[in-house]
Amino acid sequence: MNIKEAYFKCINKMIKDEFRGYDPYDGASSSYAIIQKYYYPRLFSAYFNKFSPFNFRPIFGIRQTMQNQTIGFSGLALINYYEQHKKYIEFIADRLVESSLIDRYGYHSWDLHGFPIQMRNLLQEVGMTDIGNGIIGSFFLELYKRNPNERYKDICISVRNYFLNEFLVKNKNIIFFKYTPATQDYNWCYNASTIVAAYCVLVSKYFNINFDKDSIQKAFTDVISRQKPQGEWWYSLNMNTGYEKPQIDFHQGFILDTLLDYMECVEYNERFLNSYKKGLEFYYNKQFLPNGQSIYRYPKKYPVNIQNQAQGIITFTRAAAAGFGHHYFDFAKTIAEWTIKNMQDPGGYFYYLRYPLFTNKIQYIRWSDASMVYALAIYLNYAGLSEKAP
């Protein structure tokens, strides 16, 4: 099937399923009391279900859910077919307004998953990350551009203010945005910081709101300062111990996209442009094979993670659209076609992980489907194919 058909096959299944599905991190959401109450059963369920190649969730009493981050991502994809999918877009907007935590926190923000996430040393009851809230905020910004409802504008600005007032950190002459409100002020996650900084710039510029340009720019330049000589970024830095986590994957694309957001919105200065080009070349040459298959975590080749595939489509399409070379759009097409051929189920959904001899075919609606429909929508929009369904 072609790219447009693949997009509609997936989004139509998501609509049919009412945007409900499983998640890699939903293992602690069991309906069984022993898992809900006790640490070790909860930890076992969380990690067993996350890493099992087979879906045992029904046995563990884990239900499919509608997650706020999923519908926010899905809404961003559906907006490319606004008139056709207006009913579902309005449903998503209303659902997100209803589930906002503004009464609790004073700002529009969301529990992104709707279930607890058990880590080895932490039970996260409310999943409120800057990345997920940035996705939802971006959905309302794009929705406002098509439907200038003051309620949507207020939400966009409220999310921006939440980030600026509760996430911004100044530590050891470094400025960054935290991953969550509870994140320690010494844990600096590079991609999370630039995602928030870019959102604040986009909203401030669009609604003509004054903002601290110097702090936002420094949040970007401080991340640029962590770029490695070849062009890659690692994942995070513990500013107390100096330990830098050496993880190179789809988060490289997150940083590149947000650098592009800043440059398109503010200025193409030489430092930003050189960093972007160097990072883009690394992403293109080192994190993907010529056939469109992504590298799991550079230099580790397998498994193929659907998030890597989706992000590659987004980042290379955007690079081409910004004038950095049509070959990037050609490569986005190569990635999309490889993914559709090798990681899309005949039923429409996308697979989670692909190994040389085995594929994890569990359907994860947030991690896999929402990411891919958004990526394909970005591609189709630039290709001029987002006017109507096939």
For the regions a language model picked out, list residue spans one by one.
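Glycan-recognition and catalytic cores of secretory/periplasmic carbohydrate-active enzymes
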Residues: 1-390
